Amino acid sequence: QNQPLLDALNACIAACEHCATACLQAGDVKMMARCISLDHDCADICALTARLVARGSEHAQHLLRECAEVCKACADECAQHQDQHCQECAEACRRCEQACRAGLQG
């Protein structure tokens, strides 16, 4: 029953890792510093959340709330950049935010 949530979390991890790597390889790393930082934070909290959800932890609900907030912050930042990897990351983060919020109600 948690598979759609786990899929969204894993897709977000992949998108954030790809975005951070692409930003680091771009010319102006300083301009992308907040994006890179949020990508790392988002990938990390998504990974931890996925592990807790997968094992049915009683603490998963707490992390789902925080994960949704970090996904929103990351999506908002990435959406400001025109790079394709940033736009794709913003979409994945928004989908993950929605999945986490849905998981809170389930």
Q: Residue ranges of each PLM-predicted region?
A:
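Amphipathic alpha-helical hairpins
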Residues: 1-106
